[in-house]
Amino acid sequence: HKKYLEKMIENGNAYVSKEEAKDGSGVIKEIVRFKNPNIDVTFNDLIKGEVTMNTKDLGDFVLAKNLNEPLFHLAVVVDDFEEGVTHVIRGEDHVSNTPRQILIQRAIDAPTPIYAHLPLVLGPDKLKLSKRRGALPITEYQKQGFLPEAILNGIAFVGWNPGTEKEIFTHDELVEAFDLERVQKSPAVFNETKLEWFNKEHMNKLPYQ
C-alpha cells in the first residue's frame, strides 16, 4: 500500500497532514489525506442503475494513519486492484463508500470494477437483521434440520425472483437462473415461515430410504 500512497502524494492526489492526536495526548501525527477534487462521481450499479454523488461533503478524507498504516478505503481499493477483482457485490449500506473508492482508483490508475449494491435484508419487524435482534446464523438452521439446498433456495428468493412461477431450485438451477439485474431495489424481508416451506419441499424431493 505504501507505494500507492507515495504515488498519490507525488502526483498531488494526496498529502501528508500534521495533526494533533484525538486522544488529547498532544502528540502530533503525520496522517495522509486524499486531496478531494469536489466533483460529481457517476457509476453504473447493476441493481440501482446510474448513481451520481458529489464528493464535496466528503472533505479531504484520511487514507492512512501514516505511510505504513493504510485505512479501509485505500486498503480495499489496492487489494481489489492487485487481486484483479472485476465485480464488487455488497450491501447498499456501502453505496456511500463508492465515490471515495472511485476517486482513489482514478488516482492510482486502477480500473473501476462493476458494482452491485444489494438491498438490505430486514426482519419481520422491518428492521435490519442482526444478532442483537435475534437473527440466527445459517449454521443454526442447519442444526435445526434445514437442508443446505433449502437454505440456499430460500435465501436466493429474499429480494430476488426468476421472473417465472417456479420457486423450487437445485443449486445448479439457481446458478443458471440467478441474475443480479432481477434483484429488487427495495429492502427485502426475511420470512422464516417461507424458509420452512422451502425446506419441506426439498425434503419431499429426497429419495425414499
Task: Enumerate the language-model features and the residues they cover.
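Active-site cores that bind ATP or allylic diphosphates and position pyrophosphate for catalysis
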Residues: 3-131, 137-138, 162
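Catalytic adenosine-cofactor/nucleotide-binding cores of aminoacyl-tRNA synthetases and other
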Residues: 96, 108-209
